[in-house]
Swiss-Prot record:
It comes from Psychromonas ingrahamii (strain DSM 17664 / CCUG 51855 / 37). GO terms for molecular function: DNA binding. This is Nucleoid-associated protein Ping_2276. PANTHER family: NUCLEOID-ASSOCIATED PROTEIN YBAB. Homodimer. It comes from the Bacteria.
Length: 109
């Protein structure tokens, strides 16, 4: 099936892939994206690790009802989470050679 050299090469490539994945995950964790709702009236900036960095609310919304503002904040947060998910997917597909890997995938060595 595999020669010793072939198996060694396979292990080396797997270890390189794991290192590249670690680097990509670190880059993703430091990536900042902004989600918006209400045509930009509410903006939420999050990091790749999903920590919220900033919330911006247009002053004109302070006069409107509380329920609408809550909906806009939730929509902006969902947009930001979706965007960071896309960044994560794109970054990791480059590292994994296009293979879909499960979230949190780690090499067994």
């Amino acid at each position: 099936m595999f020669s010793k050299e072939g198996m060694g090469d396979l292990m080396k490539k797997a270890q390189e892939m794991q290192e590249n994945m670690k680097k990509a995950q670190a880059e993703i964790a430091n990536t900042e994206v902004t989600g918006e709702s209400g045509a930009g009236l509410v903006k939420i900036t999050i990091l790749g690790n999903h920590n919220v960095r900033k919330v911006e609310i247009d002053p004109s919304l302070m006069e409107d009802d509380k329920e609408m503002l809550e909906d806009l904040i939730a929509a902006a947060m969902n947009d930001a989470v979706h965007r960071i998910g896309e960044v994560n997917k794109n970054k990791m597909s480059g590292v994994s050679g296009g293979m879909e890997l499960p979230p949190g995938f780690k090499m067994p060595f």
